[in-house]
Each structure stands twice: as structure tokens, then as C-alpha cells.
Amino acid sequence: MELATMGKVNEVLFMNGGEGEISYAQNSSFTEKVASMAMPALENAVETLFSKDFHLLPALNAADLGCAAGPNTFAVISMIKRMMEKKCRELYCQTPELQVYLNDLFGNDFNTLFKGLSSEVVGNKCEEVSCYVMGVPGSFHGRLFPRNSLHLVHSSYSVHWLTQAPKGLTSREGLALNKGKIYISKTSPPAVKEAYLSQFHEDFTMFLNARSQEVVPNGCMVLILHGRQSSDPSEMESCFTWELLAIAIAELVSQGLIDEDKLDTFNVPSYFPSLEEVKDIVERDGSFTIDHLEGFELDSLEMQENDKWVRGDKFAKMVRAFTEPIISNQFGHEIMDKLYDKFTHIVVSDLEAELPKTTSIILVLSKIVG
């Protein structure tokens, strides 16, 4: 089934739920590292809000978009609370209350998410910062909140997901342009790269437009995206995960376990942009100023683990946690164990050549006044 519409992607794009060994909750250590690296940017954003007299408000409204069900969103809430307490002590002022909205698509495991909201995260109403948390299911590519209602928006490793597989990936004769691949690769024709960038441009612009209506003037957004350093989207730094998954799928095709047509017609609804592409889209939109934009690299694997099979297995489980729902929708639930077992073996083989580092982008924006 092709992911050709926003509605279809919204139904199947979510992380593995629960708390089992292939759940996102148990396999989010990499995104936890990314979030930790980006935490100073979020701290600075809260500090900036307080420098603009946002501490005089009765409540600070913050949203975490694409929150999933792992522990990372809890760290975000705790950090915002700590910064609010710190700034209000420095300013000798009464601390505003904190309203946090946790957003993700309808298939997200909100039960596991809210089960993890311990008193250590939210605190009690007698603390300096009274914290209230609400779930907001829905697509962040459209409006989610009333006009001028948000002061702070955070999103980590979510905005690079697309509303649909890129348009225009079939020829006039109806043939697949990206045959045998599920994402941009070195063998992809230029039209595939152009289609992916065009879809990201359209979707990120929709995201910015929706937030421009919801965020108050001078409000802040802190966005962390999976991105790339190179200007070429087919470089291995940005496509190696999808490339290895495509190899695993192709092997199951050769064994007769998957129809070849299913592989040829599947294109992942995700795009890892360059810093220049992100900057260009924000400036074209014109609703926000860029306060900070940087890229940084992290090892894709647990490098302190010496056993390559343990490292490969950890990486495969991490990838399975965020890809299985959308992959199984196309190729069938019944072959997922075989597919990811094959993927693990391919990853371990690739360890001999060393996997490339993963690039993340930190983007801090302020809503333009007027």
C-alpha cells in the first residue's frame, strides 16, 4: 500500500509502543543523546523568554511536538521547570504556572507516555512551578492550538518526517523511478532527489505557517532535526539506514517472501535536510527569525561496546523501534522478525567498514512581531 496521502501516513507513522525490547521507550538512547546535546539551546530559549517579560504572565504555555512515548519528553519538561524556577529566583518574581502540551499522531502510544509521567517530572502543585500536562493528538503540519496561545515550542527528531511519500516518483508510463530503493541513494535519478526536497519544502512550510499562527510574537521554537552536513542528499551520512533496510528487503524479495513491486513502489516519507535547505525555507516563509542554527555529529552506534554483534543488535532494535510501523504497513507484519534479523546481519557486516556518523540540526526561531 503506497503512502501517497497525508491521511495514510498519519495512520501508520508512529514509534513502536509499549515497553518491550523493541519498543521506542526501550530504544531511544540515541535520541536521548541528541536531546541532551540540544538542551543548552532550549535553556537559552527559556532565558530569552524571561528577558522579554514572559515571566509576568500567569502561565507559560509550552508544546512538545512529535513527543513519541519515550523518556526524552520528560527531560524537556523537567528542564523547562528548572529554568523557570532559576530565572524567577534571579528576578525575585512570582513563578508562572507551566502548561505543557504533548503532541503526536493518533497512533502514538499515549498510554505509555502518560504512565511515565511521574511526580518527579510533573512535581506537585506546592512546588515553585505548578505544572499541568495535556495530550494533543494530531498532525503538527496543520493547526493544533488557538491563535497566539503558545510561548515555547519544542520538537526533537520529528519535523524531518513528511506528510506523504514524495509526489512524482513514477514515470509517465507508471514505472517506479526509484526501483529497488526506499529512499534517495547514489543510483536514484535526479528527479527523486528533487521530489524529496520539494515535499520537505512543502511540508516544513506548512509546519511553519501553522506555528506562526499559534506562537505569540517573540515566542520561541527549538527544533531538532535529523539532517546532513553534505549538500548531496545521497551521501551515506544521510541515507545509510534506509540503504541497509532496502538491502534487507531486497534479500527477502529474492527469497520470494516479498513482492518486488512492493519494494519498487515504496518510498519512505522522511527527508534529512541540509542546514542550507532549512535556512532557505525559514527565510522564504518569513514568519520567524533564526536565532541559532547549527549541525553536530554523533556516532550512530554505541561505540563503547566492543562486541560487534551487541552493537549491531542495539542499532537494529533502535531502527526497528522507529521504522517498523511504517515498514510493516507496506510489507506485512508477518515478516518483520525475518526482515529485522536480516537487517541486523547486514549492519554487523557493515561495521567492518564503520558506519557514518549521524548529523543533527538545532534550529532556534523567534516569532517576528507585527
From Swiss-Prot:
It is an enzyme of class 2 (transferase). Belongs to the methyltransferase superfamily. Type-7 methyltransferase family. One of its GO terms (biological process) is alkaloid metabolic process. It comes from the Eukaryota. Pfam families: Methyltransf_7. This is 3,7-dimethylxanthine N-methyltransferase CkTbS. S-adenosyl-L-homocysteine binds at residues 24, 67, 72, 104-105, 139-140. Disulfide bonds: none annotated. Its EC number is 2.1.1.159. Binds 1 Mg(2+) ion per subunit. GO terms for molecular function: metal ion binding; methyltransferase activity. PANTHER family: S-ADENOSYL-L-METHIONINE:CARBOXYL METHYLTRANSFERASE FAMILY PROTEIN. Keywords: Alkaloid metabolism, Magnesium, Metal-binding, Methyltransferase, S-adenosyl-L-methionine, Transferase. The gene is TBS. Caffeine is catabolized to produce theacrine in Camellia sinensis var. assamica cv. Kucha, but not in cv. Puer. It catalyses: 7-methylxanthine + S-adenosyl-L-methionine = theobromine + S-adenosyl-L-homocysteine + H(+). Its cofactor is Mg(2+). Changing residue 241 to I: Slight theacrine synthase activity which mediates the conversion of 1,3,7-trimethyluric acid to theacrine. Moderate theacrine synthase activity. InterPro entries: MeTrfase_7, MeTrfase_capping, SAM-dependent_MTases_sf. Involved in the biosynthesis of caffeine in cv. Puer. Involved in the biosynthesis of theacrine in cv. Kucha, a caffeine-like xanthine alkaloid with diverse beneficial biological activities including anti-depressive, sedative, and hypnotic activities, improving learning and memory, increasing exercise activity, and preventing nonalcoholic fatty liver disease. Catalyzes the conversion of 7-methylxanthine (7mX) to theobromine but not able to convert paraxanthine to caffeine. Theobromine binds at residues 31, 157, 160-161, 226, 322. It comes from Camellia sinensis var. assamica (Assam tea). The record marks 154, 226, 270, 318, 333 as: Involved in substrate discrimination. Pathway: Alkaloid biosynthesis. Mg(2+) binds at residues 178, 264, 266-267.
